[in-house]
Amino acid sequence: MGSVSNLVSPNICHPAPPCLTSRSNKFPWTKPISGLLFYRSVTPIKRCHLVRRSCVVSASLTGNLGRLKRNVQDFTSMNYWVVRDYYRLVESVNSLEPQIQSLSDEQLKAKTAEFRERLARGESLADMQAEAFAVVREAAKRTIGMRHFDVQIIGGGVLHDGSIAEMKTGEGKTLVSTLAAYLNALTGEGVHVVTVNDYLAQRDAEWMGRVHRFLGLSVGLIQRGMKAEERKFNYSCDITYTNNSELGFDYLRDNLTSNREQLVMRWPKPFHFAIVDEVDSVLIDEGRNPLLISGEANENAARYPVAAKVAELLVKDSHYKVELKENSVELTEEGISLAEMALETGDLWDENDPWARFVMNALKAKEFYKRDVQYIVRDGKALIINELTGRVEDKRRWSEGVHQAVEAKEGLEIQADSIVVAQITYQSLFKLYPKLSGMTGTAKTEEKEFLKMFQIPVIEVPTNLSNIRIDLPIQAFATARGKWEHVRREVEDMFGQGRPVLVGTTSVENSEYLSELLKEWGIPHNVLNARPKYAAREADFIAQAGRKYAITISTNMAGRGTDIILGGNPKMLAREIIEDSILSYLTSEVLADNIDDDELSQKVLSKIKVGPSSLALLARASLMAKYVGKSESKSWTRKKAKSVVTESLEKSQTMDPMELQNLINEQSEMYPLGPAIALAYLSVLKDCEAHCLHEGSEVKRLGGLHVIGTSLHESRRIDNQLRGRAGRQGDPGSTRFMISLQDEMFQKFNFDTEWAVRLISKITNDEDLPIEGDTIVKQLLALQINAEKYFFGIRKSLVEFDEVLEVQRKHVYDLRQLLLTGENESCSQHIFQYMQAVVDEIVVGNSNPQKHPRYWSLAKLLKEFMAISGNLLDESFSGITEETMLQSLENLHEGSSIEMEDLSLPHLPKPPNAFRGIRRKNSSLRRWLDICSDNLTGSGSYRTLINLLRKFLGDYLIASYLNVVQESGFDDGYIKEIERAVLLKTLDCYWRDHLVNMNKLSSAVNVRSFAHRNPLEEYKIDGCRFFISMLSATRRLTVESILQYWSSPMESQELFIS
């Protein structure tokens, strides 16, 4: 079933390359292969086909030439050989199917424990891959009624091998993920299945989770708004479903917490294996936007409204220049003068009265941040629209004052400015996984980027059925008016035929413009965009988008992850009927922003006609819901009411109608709402399936779903995602792109619109008529390729810069986790190391191994040493002067007989309880002293003297600290918590400041390119210098804080950390 083994020709004249006769976790083509070697390896195949071509040329030449060319390309494609190799896995899985089918449910469940025992005995996952896949296939068939096709087995193998599986829309990627997720979860180290939003994560956890739970694995779900305890439990499960942003923020939050009980991930190894759904969206589209956690900064919010008024005074091109491609503005001399005059300041860049940043942000808000395109205003707040998905991200804010500038432009309350306290890019986040895989319908065009950035190949998995979608030629218009009018006509034409239509737009503004246009012509339709009144019903709209006469206008969100099934999705439609009948009796809440009053809304479309038995069951379920609602005073929230319906629908999947009816009869006096809803759902579902099957056949006869793209995107891949909505699983369908030369993309990337207008004028005098053909398509393709290269350059630069920061971040986060989760003694060891390191810096910074101590800065050395100790050394070192220390060093240098075991220097005080302190210190400092002891001071006659001095002062400081801690009377647990708190707080404080400095540096180094210096190399050098300085400052503040804490009066002890 579902086999595509006919793709493997029986007439192959050349065996598979040796490197492809067995699979491994990393494929050989991830390494650089010279073009010469590659073409030599495939030359025999080409020869073979040339021979075959000579045999068939005498037949119908015209009919065979295209197919022959395609066959040659198949056999010379590396992808062909890889897929061919995976058919060995398919054969193994298929051969095991009869044996697995014969197992009882209990025997099938017991396979999980058996696999884990075999792993413990030394077998590898590869040894049991085929059998595990066969077990999952059978479990899916028994639990959710779905059997993996052969091509889906290939997809599972690709995922397990740590590659990206490109599978076209409707090929069942969600089901494919169960294979690799189950196999890798057997190790007990945790598997993350990552989706692009909460809805898909919840859907997959509930739907595919049934397969895993049936086999005895635990399944977790991470959702926005969950508490730390819930997150911790769900991350501890064998398989965890989450979305990419929640995963990233949980990682960052775990590295900000000061309480080990608040850690939610599986530390010390939170990452094992991830399957990323829509991997191109996560790693490429979202790759330009790093994840940021911000804290409030002390900024003057009153400046933003003033700057917004100044921006309104300034005129584009006269007072400032705009670079659309770079999203940057530059003030002219005239603009600077006018701004300074309006603000009554002599210099916009005055450090004591800085206005430049506020004015530049106000101009950016004016030119680049458009309402209903980049953001919407709701409840007095400016909410970001993700331009790639079309969804509102209400928890996200633009950084560096841009969001405040937008709020000022809109006259909204200005929220507190922010500074970054933690950040990471998605590229760096997913590189933390030892094994990473992904799946999507559109990755092949970005294969080079995946290979270069992640060393992950893209494998194109064959479709189960041939693709018969028709992609109509692109139509180009000189004006936007002409484009929208032709879109309207095409929608009207398709509506007249009864074909469903999906229109893709790039913004809320465009979707609502087209909606108004269709309303004027009386064409009923649904709108799906970021506005909450539409977004809340995204899945419902997409479920009906394949029905006869359905017209759906959508932004880029386009319901990714939800298939558009011709004739409608019977399960979604049946659920909608149940909810319409039940919810109003259980809750008094209604959907905010009700859209059903619009007479042109297609919410109901043509209502599914349910049979008499279904109507009776619906009436009974409604009656019970009415009774339950009355007894509860309709106090349930809509969310709780929907969860009751969801639980009931899940029950319908595990019980047959007879069992449900018996349950209702047994509990009739208790008004068993759940069984009644489940029974009604099964009956309604049967009616919906019959209706959708009939309507789907009718839609197929008419030509299937028609997709209209109203603008080219900045990547061919995103255009292909929209095209992929039509023609799923061998269905008929068609697509058409209509573009205007006034579209923003042409302005942003400096397309030669004058050339295009001249070309159009040669063909027609009507500027509202379209042109199409190879000439214009080639130009548009070149434009998209340039855009792809540009954004690839941005992502590449972001990754390269973040790789520098990632080294530093890993050091800080590893240290943090060691302090947070390590033994109590590790905190003391770090305190001792920091004390010795700070003393080393003081001594080395004020001495010279080539000069006599009388030429050292002994007064400064002594002052700095006393300053770090608070009041701890006031009594013992009160009589020590520069002369005393000089005399001690001279005596020591002349005597040369004192050893460090004496733990003292002439004329200087002996450490209290010295031997006890040093014994404890030596165990912790051994590695530190081995590494840096004799390499800090350089060469010279007085090198040994410097080493003795810094070791003595370090010993003295540590011994004094241990003495005062012991005399405090506090127990060890309290002392270690104080140490941990000081260590974490100082580290966080300086890491936060370091991130601010590094962000400033990343902007500043670009200017150095004008001096022919490499910005990345400059960033590495200065960033390293900043990091070393940060670590030094962290150590010093830690030592100062901990010593000041213990040396201050007990009634006023505080952590002196700003």
UniProtKB/Swiss-Prot annotation:
Entry annotated with the keyword Lipoprotein: no
E.C. code: 7.4.2.4
Catalytically driven reaction(s): ATP + H2O + chloroplast-proteinSide 1 = ADP + phosphate + chloroplast-proteinSide 2
Entry similarity comment: Belongs to the SecA family.
Organism the protein comes from: Arabidopsis thaliana (Mouse-ear cress)
Alphabetized UniProt keyword annotations: ATP-binding, Chloroplast, Membrane, Nucleotide-binding, Plastid, Protein transport, Transit peptide, Translocase, Translocation, Transport
Class of this enzyme: translocase
Biological processes, Gene Ontology terms: intracellular protein transport; protein import; protein targeting
Transit peptide: 1-58
Deleted gene: phenotype: Embryo lethal.
Lineage: superkingdom: Eukaryota
Subunit (UniProt): Part of a second Sec protein translocation apparatus. Interacts probably with SCY2.
Keyword set includes Translocase: yes
Misc remark: Cannot substitute for SECA1.
UniProt: ATP binding residues: 167-174
Protein name: Protein translocase subunit SECA2, chloroplastic
Cell location: Plastid, Chloroplast membrane
Described purpose of this protein according to its UniProt entry: Involved in protein export. Probably interacts with other proteins to allow the postimport or conservative sorting pathway for inner membrane proteins in plastids. May have a central role in coupling the hydrolysis of ATP to the transfer of proteins across the membrane.
Bilayer topology: Peripheral membrane protein
